[in-house]
Regions:
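Post-DEXD/H (motif II) to motif III coupling segment of the RecA-like Helicase ATP-binding lobe
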Residues: 113-147
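Conserved pre-motif I regulatory segment
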Residues: 1-29
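Walker B catalytic acidic pair
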Residues: 109-111
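Loop/turn-to-beta-strand initiation segments
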Residues: 51, 80-81, 103-105, 131-136
Length: 147
């Protein structure tokens, strides 16, 4: 049981794991539809004993990961320490919340959106609260053109 990856994603995942040996923040930049969500899912599964957070820009993208969990033969109950949030809601996160929810790992889906003025507030607070948190950012478009 676990998350099976296509060959090109296995190569990327192995590089992610290698980078996490030296760094706390790693980014995967792959084209749309290439399986970034499955790389995220495998990383969350492999770290399921840790307190993890999956942050997405929309409920639709959050729900997509949940569908991938189920299509991989897993259940949400296999991820007892995983929480979900969306950037708009996380922007107003409080210090008290972060004290009560000490995360070890976070996936930033479409991480380029973290650069948005409002959405970055919660992310910055999270990273400042826990500078040793492992961060996996995934995006097909890592450059923000709207700023």
């Amino acid at each position: 049981m676990g998350v099976e990856l296509y060959k090109h994603n296995k190569v990327a995942y192995e590089k992610v794991e290698k980078m996490f040996e030296k760094e706390n923040r790693v980014a995967v930049v792959h084209p749309t539809g290439s399986g970034k969500s499955f790389i995220s899912l495998k990383w969350l599964y492999d770290n399921r004993d840790k307190k993890c957070l999956f942050l997405a820009p929309t409920l639709a993208i959050r729900d997509q990961l949940i569908r991938h969990i189920k299509s991989s033969g897993l259940e949400l109950s296999d991820f007892k320490n995983l929480e979900f949030a969306i950037y708009p809601n996380f922007a107003s996160i409080t210090d008290e919340f972060l004290e009560q929810h000490h995360y070890d790992c976070v996936v930033l889906d479409e991480f380029h959106r973290c650069g948005a003025t409002e959405w970055s507030k919660g992310i910055n607070k999270l990273l400042n609260h826990n500078p040793n948190i492992k961060v996996l950012g995934v995006s097909a478009t890592p450059i923000r053109y709207l700023d």
